Amino acid sequence: MHDKILILDFGSQVTQLIARRVREAHVYCEIHPNDVSDEFVREFAPKAVILSGSHASTYEDHQLRAPQAVWDLGVPVLGICYGMQTMAVQLGGKVEWSDHREFGYAEMRAHGHTRLLDGIEDFTTAEGHGMLKVWMSHGDKVAELPPGFALMASTPSCPIAGMADEARGYYAVQFHPEVTHTVKGRQIIERFVLQIAGAKPDWIMSNHIEEAVAKIREQVGDEEVILGLSGGVDSSVAAALIHRAIGDQLTCVFVDHGLLRLNEGKMVLDMFEGRLHAKVVHVDASEQFLGHLTGVTDPEAKRKIIGREFVEVFQAEAQKLSKAKWLAQGTIYPDVVESGGTKTKKATTIKSHHNVGGLPETLGLKLLEPLRDLFKDEVRELGVALGLPPEMVYRHPFPGPGLGVRILGEVKREYADLLRRADAIFIEELRGTTATAQDAAAGLCGEADVGKTWYDLTSQAFAVFLPVKSVGVMGDGRTYDYVTSLRAVQTTDFMTAHWAHLPYALLGRASNRIINEVRGINRVVYDISGKPPATIEWE
């Protein structure tokens, strides 16, 4: 029986990141709405409780509160951002509007040598004060500590940036330790979960396989399952896991929607029919997809259309299988989060994912999502534990809508052909270039990264087609052709990301090759936007 951490979600877009950090400490956790009943909290029997952030304010008429049972259990509690504010209000403190809102990077001073922050610092001031580099996102602030609490941290704009009641094991921070921008955030959460809560670190993917297989068998019984196979990491691992559970009851449906990467169809069929010996049905539906996308420019509309057409194709294939009752998908946590689909339904929608946004209520198949509660690196760990080859497991993620969300505006076959060739060149250059000692000296990578390919050093890389033309010169002639943008990011969780600082020589080779080898493109740019404020995909 795993020790469990209960994460109460107040509607933050990054609540799942809290879960990711807890799981990185190999401790099992679950996310549930903040308004669960006292009985639920008691029956859950958590080793500790974490209160998430929120876009809401403690001043709103319908204030979000933690159940009273949280304070009656006698277990450690960690409040984050809004979670700190509701802890303060519920336990007798005071919260007020802040004249100096904080959104972004801040330097925070630790006070009092509490168990949570003791010995954790990024640098020390001349006066000897330990300082932390943190990420803030708040408009309200705690103005008065609740009884029994002591000051734990502060910033110039937020005098009470952290508070602690060590006797009861209550800790709260105004910053977000779950995001990668908080340098020591992972260490802080591990400290809370492992040392303060005393949870056992026994949550590992090799153990998860047995539980997941048993759950799939219980759900499916003797019914048949169809799965949309894209060749990406998520659908591949989902297919392997389901195949492990029910064997030939699974039929993989590979749909060529005309928006795949270069030579992807052949690679997918060779991989799954040849290596996994799974049943694969190949459906060429490119005319169907591209036809419905004609004239459509809105990103959400494109995603919904692609999702809808996937469902229609799957339904058509399901009718050919007498026992097909289930549609399996490789949906993972970030898909659900970016669709505003947390269990509370309070998160603000950023974009809909094809796996969750395009399914009509009248879908004739039941939905099987065995990876829904896992993050990307957990999915990769699961794939390795299932025996999948590294080239499959560590391939960069590819969106379900394919190149449809990497072509800005209207999708045309001409645009897709140009983009897939440009994308292939960029990926080829990343795979063929290794990091050097000079790259490390320039701060582009760490010393331990020397010798690794830049493909392995980036988490996701791709080209984007821009439907605008620019003037160029080739030979003695004037050109007027399209523009493509290269995008490469580094991230541990895909919830936040930094743009990859690639060597100029690599970018130069990729640009020169694209312009010379892809007729129709005469300008290449590089995207240096982080997430936030930008998303990883352009649409």
UniProtKB/Swiss-Prot annotation:
Residues 203-395 form the GMPS ATP-PPase domain. The active site is at C81 (nucleophile), H176, E178. It comes from the Bacteria. InterPro entries: Class_I_gatase-like, GATASE, GMP_synth_C, GMP_synth_GATase, GMP_synthase, GMPS_ATP_PPase_dom, NAD/GMP_synthase, Rossmann-like_a/b/a_fold. Residues 4-202 form the Glutamine amidotransferase type-1 domain. ATP binds at S230, G231, G232, V233, D234, S235, S236. It catalyses: XMP + L-glutamine + ATP + H2O = GMP + L-glutamate + AMP + diphosphate + 2 H(+). GO terms for molecular function: ATP binding; GMP synthase activity. Keywords: ATP-binding, Glutamine amidotransferase, GMP biosynthesis, Ligase, Nucleotide-binding, Purine biosynthesis. Signal peptide: none annotated. Pfam families: GATase (PF00117), GMP_synt_C (PF00958), NAD_synthase (PF02540). It is an enzyme of class 6 (ligase). Pathway: Purine metabolism; GMP biosynthesis; GMP from XMP (L-Gln route): step 1/1. The keyword Cytoplasm does not apply. Its EC number is 6.3.5.2. GO terms for cellular component: cytosol. HAMAP family: GMP_synthase. Catalyzes the synthesis of GMP from XMP. Homodimer. NCBIfam families: guaA_Cterm, guaA_Nterm, PRK00074.1. This is GMP synthase [glutamine-hydrolyzing]. It comes from Burkholderia ambifaria (strain ATCC BAA-244 / DSM 16087 / CCUG 44356 / LMG 19182 / AMMD) (Burkholderia cepacia (strain AMMD)).
